[in-house]
């Protein structure tokens, strides 16, 4: 009774400063009132009126949660909802979906929350990180940038990315590598999804002026929890390649299969690895592969440190080019 009275009083007292009051009760009995921004990778972000910085709360430490905010909600099963949520008297969570009505789920089934309204801005997200290195030997200078912006809807997600690396040193040609693209995912029941990608690569090391790659496939998340996710995708791609020098341009069809693993239940550190293989359909014996390994350490104020490794391999490169190229980068970034 005392806790209920205190809880009600706290919600009333903060109502003057928040257009929408959300609240939760932790397993240790503490009560936090504020505005839920999102929950991703097992961490809930809360904006409060009594702190200059947002609170980060481990999802597994929450006992009860109450909110009338409109959320995009994803369960570990891949089921998606759109609406507010509140804890029930039985210890589960009731989601009031705007389409299907009330659904009762376990709290630990929820793996993603994002507070949204009917505006475009609330569904956007972005990040950018920059790196710069100087080495006295050979007067090496290297500048790198990695960036991404995306939009999340109820049943689909779209992203655009752009990455650039430029390196110079004495007695050798400058090295430039630019890559990026557009990607789209349509989410199906039970954590299946349809990926559509259009990517580009320009790489002086492999004598690639421009490689365009259009992909269509089918994927599934086999693990999707507050500790990690692991997915696999297969499909087909069309490749158009323009090379430096006298090498002829190429157009080819490829199959592809790839996997992605993200681990994030390790404090402020997260690890992301992706591997994709492209066996050619129209060029006998040719196959390509892309590999990405990123580690990210979260800092205050939405800043982060990132350490990344990227590898591109082609077993049939054009004459005069190497069969592989890799990038090792470090940078300071900001996420929004």
Residue spans for each PLM region:
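Membrane-embedded beta-strand positions in outer-membrane beta-barrel channels/transporters
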Residues: 127-129, 144-146, 177-181, 193, ...
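Transmembrane beta-barrel strands of outer-membrane/channel proteins
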Residues: 128-134, 147, 160-164, 180-182, ...
């Amino acid at each position: 009774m005392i806790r209920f009275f205190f809880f009600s009083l706290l919600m009333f007292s903060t109502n003057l400063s928040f257009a929408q009051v959300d609240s939760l009760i932790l397993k240790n009995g503490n009560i936090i009132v504020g505005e839920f921004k999102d929950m991703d990778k097992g961490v809930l972000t809360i904006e409060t009126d009594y702190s200059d910085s947002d609170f980060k709360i481990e999802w597994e430490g929450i006992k009860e949660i109450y909110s009338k905010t409109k959320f995009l909600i994803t369960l570990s099963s891949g089921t998606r909802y759109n609406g507010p949520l509140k804890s029930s008297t039985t210890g589960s969570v009731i989601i009031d979906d705007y389409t299907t009505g009330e659904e009762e789920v376990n709290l630990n089934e929820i793996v993603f929350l994002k507070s949204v309204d009917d505006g475009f801005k609330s569904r956007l997200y972005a990040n950018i990180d920059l790196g710069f290195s100087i080495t006295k030997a050979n007067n090496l200078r290297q500048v790198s940038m990695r960036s991404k912006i995306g939009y999340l809807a109820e049943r689909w997600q779209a992203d655009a990315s752009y990455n650039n690396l430029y390196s110079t040193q004495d007695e050798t040609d400058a090295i430039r590598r630019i890559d990026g693209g557009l990607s789209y995912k349509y989410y199906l029941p039970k954590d299946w999804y349809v990926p559509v990608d259009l990517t580009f690569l320009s790489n002086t090391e492999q004598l690639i002026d421009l490689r365009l790659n259009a992909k269509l496939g089918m994927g599934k998340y086999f693990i999707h929890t507050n500790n990690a996710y692991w997915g696999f995708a297969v499909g087909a791609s069309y490749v158009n390649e323009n090379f430096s020098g006298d090498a002829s341009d190429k157009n080819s069809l490829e199959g592809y299969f790839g996997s992605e693993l993200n681990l994030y239940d390790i404090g402020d550190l997260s690890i992301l690895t992706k591997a994709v293989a492209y066996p050619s359909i129209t060029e006998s014996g040719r196959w390509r592969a892309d590999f990405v390994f990123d580690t990210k350490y979260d800092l205050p104020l939405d800043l982060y440190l990132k350490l990344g490794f990227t590898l591109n391999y082609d077993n049939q490169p054009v004459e005069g080019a190497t069969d592989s190229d890799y990038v090792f980068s470090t940078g300071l970034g900001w996420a929004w």
